[in-house]
Regions:
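Active-site core of glycosidic bond-cleaving carbohydrate-active enzymes
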Residues: 231-536
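Active-site lumenal/periplasmic loops and adjacent helix-entry segments of GT-C-fold
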Residues: 228
Length: 536
């Protein structure tokens, strides 16, 4: 029924005549979920600690899980269960009568969380510009003890906090067990971890794999706590890591088809798709950087699978994304970011004034090369003959207008802003190569005034640019410091936002709503597998 609703949606609004068929293809590639039953490994107690990440840590409690699960419940008690790993799925609470019989409902507040501070920071007054509804706390009224209660809401996290809000004194009952049905479509890892990794890199590798595994559901989600949806930019990075881990290419195919089928009225990809109750796009979310990364995902999918039928089927979508991007390019071969109202996302540092014009110029050049490569593999270069010439002219225009030969860096926008992202994308696009690339990256990274990356997403591209520029020792050090910093601060899965110098950084103005298991942060596996000689 839901799939039908979705098909109806595309039939009535589709830009591409094959959209309804594409949606069926997406359904046909939907993976099954694997289930793992998890139980808590220990009880923990929170401690405010300004040396801990975001000011809170958990210590082992002297009470065992079985002692906690036989304690008569009384209002005011708080139990915190530690499951020892990050999980995505469904929580079941079991209660058991210990003495006499139930004479009043039991009232509990349960909360799942990924990080200690998320469970211990007061949430009111709510400070984020995202909904309070993302927090995973629920009030339960249990009318019948001795019956399992399974929460219908899917949750994500490692810790479960149960507060007793109301319990009768005239009978005793205990929270006899808590279990968690953890789900993921990832399955077994198909690729072995390289043998020669240092202990620190091994730890980073493990956390990366866990991050991707948790985000692999019936789509690649960005974060299983939040936003629980499919974003094109996250998909690109996830698909790269999937190659070197679970190799579930059907999931990538499903996601490519969903974006194509649910494109906007003008054929551009909508940046993100919400899967439930039926797949639908977040109407109006037009983000050109992610439109173009969809092309790269299709190219990488083709390289991984050799599935030319799918790539041929979807080629027109890739071409449409490219045409749309080229419509912003003026006679001077500069991408005009003000031409239309569009979201150009490279990093959440956009809230701190990151200027994206130079990075967008470069991202367009990179996309032209990638789309041309796709056309070449599909025998369709005759349709895009002009691409290499445009890319060459855009490269020259970037050097002419944005490159400061004296300082050896790319400046962005009218204020001539210096940022690491501008250099990164210029290197990725081949606008800066060799010694010039090294100089630009080194200068921006060392300059305190330059805008540094604020997310693992942006950092991924920095590490990639370093490798491309031949700064291999620096790339290894940067990756180890950045992702290793999260591991040292207790990450079981990698976080959405991370600044080594600011544990409270939040793109949403309130850190508890940040996602601590975030797709775009899982890429160390990609680097360690793709460049074994660099990361060992
Ligand atoms: C965030 C999402 C996602 C990202 C977009 C731009 O809210 O979590 O990961 O791709 O924004």
């Amino acid at each position: 029924m839901n799939a039908l609703l979705s098909i109806l949606l595309v039939v009535t609004s589709a830009f591409y005549p094959q959209s309804a068929k594409w949606l069926e293809q997406a359904e046909a590639s939907k993976p099954a979920l694997h289930h793992t039953l998890c139980t808590p490994v220990r009880m923990v107690e929170p401690h405010a600690d300004n040396t801990a990440f975001q000011g809170w840590r958990y210590d082992a409690s002297p009470v065992t899980v079985s002692e906690a699960c036989s304690t008569p419940l009384r209002a005011g008690q708080v139990f915190t269960f530690d499951f020892g790993r990050h999980m995505v799925g469904y929580l079941t609470l079991n209660t058991r009568t210990l003495r006499r019989c139930q004479d009043a409902p039991l009232r509990l507040r349960v909360m799942m969380g990924e990080l200690p501070a998320e469970l211990n920071t007061p949430l009111e007054p709510w400070g984020a510009w995202l909904s309070r509804g993302w927090m995973q706390d629920e009030v339960l009224t249990i009318e019948q003890v001795d019956q399992p209660v399974t929460l219908s809401r899917r949750m994500a996290g490692r810790y479960l906090k149960v507060e007793v809000l109301g319990a009768s004194k005239d009978f005793d009952c205990a929270l006899s067990s808590v279990t968690f049905d953890a789900v993921s479509s990832a399955g077994e890892e198909q690729v072995r971890m390289p043998d020669n990794l240092s202990d620190e890199l091994q730890a980073i590798y493990r956390v990366s794999v866990a991050t991707l595994q948790e985000c692999m559901q019936t789509v690649y989600e960005d974060g299983p706590k939040r936003d629980r949806r499919l974003w094109s930019g996250d998909l690109y990075l996830q698909s790269l890591v999937n190659r070197y881990s679970f190799r579930n290419f059907d999931l990538t195919k499903r996601c490519l088809y969903l974006f194509a089928a649910l494109a906007a009225d003008d054929g551009t990809i909508i940046s993100n798709i919400i899967e439930q109750p039926y797949p639908h796009p977040q109407i109006g979310s037009y983000m050109i950087t992610y439109c173009l990364l969809w092309n790269s995902t299709l190219l990488e999918y083709l390289i991984d699978t050799g599935d030319t039928a799918t790539a041929q089927d979807l080629w027109q979508v890739a071409k449409r994304q490219m045409e749309d991007a080229l419509s912003y390019v003026g006679e001077d071969y500069i991408f005009d970011i003000h031409k239309r109202d569009v979201w150009i996302f490279f990093d959440w540092r956009e809230h701190e004034g990151l200027d994206v014009s130079a990075a967008m110029q470069a991202a367009t050049v990179f996309a032209i090369d990638q789309t041309y490569d796709l056309a070449r593999r599909l025998g369709r270069t005759n349709e895009v003959k002009h691409y290499p010439d445009i890319a060459a002219k855009m490269r020259r225009a970037a050097i002419r207008q944005m490159y400061d030969a004296k300082r050896g860096v790319i400046f962005s926008g009218p204020e001539r802003q210096l940022s690491v992202q501008s250099q990164t994308w210029a290197v990725k696009a081949g606008i800066l190569t060799g010694a010039k690339a090294r100089k630009a990256l080194t200068t921006a990274l060392a300059d305190r005034q330059a805008i540094q990356p604020g997310t693992p997403y942006a950092t991924h591209y920095v590490v990639e640019a370093m490798v491309l520029a031949g700064m291999t020792a620096e790339a290894r050090e940067y990756l180890t410091d950045y992702w290793g910093g999260m591991v040292r601060k207790g990450a079981d899965t990698f976080w959405e936002a991370y600044d080594p110098n600011n544990d409270y950084l939040s793109p949403y103005d309130f850190f508890p709503v940040n996602s601590a298991c975030h797709a775009w942060s899982c890429t160390p596996v990609y680097f360690m597998q793709k460049y074994p000689e660099v990361f060992k």
